[in-house]
């Protein structure tokens, strides 16, 4: 377990916490440690990654570039935080490692905004 935010690089961020889904990077927030997944794994193999980082999914994926390109893990990422994630996340993942198949699933519970991108490589 790591007490750190998922991000593209190892750094410090300012995070404004809020009730439920209200957390976000904000200069007026509390200073928190941020880590990239590549840094945490330090080259170790990973077979599955789940991202749901309240709109920072692309930043977290950028911090997993080596792991994705080297090991092609199964990936599940939230898509409902930012409208453009429906396009940018699959394109970015595909740019890191060709051969992924992409699936979108809308969960059947209330509230109905739990839309996820599933990425499965053909290896």
Where are the model-predicted features located?
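Phosphate/nucleotide-binding beta-alpha loop and adjacent structural elements of enzyme active sites
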Residues: 1-123
